[in-house]
């Protein structure tokens, strides 16, 4: 069994997280802002103002998504081999956990709408894959050469 190159894994995870954070911010502010307003209205609250602390929470969430995506990629390399195909699968698995099933629990509570869930889930399907591929491209196993499949 080979050892994980933790520095490369963290760098790849950070790159993936930055991609996820930027794309999520742009998407939520520009594409689904009206959907969020409907959720706020349904909850009987005014539109929320983003504060530095609020943005930090989003950054922590996307940091987790990025790091876990690349950690999955690193672990999956043993059975699937290094390369973009494995990165795609790591991105899909992370998407299922974070973007598909995670928000679903908030729909019956009224904190998330079906329309918002579908739109965000569809968008994050693609961004999760792109971020995983970008982060995985930076990963190299400790010691030795490797060939991407």
What positions do the PLM features span?
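Juxtamembrane/disordered regions of integral membrane proteins
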Residues: 1-149
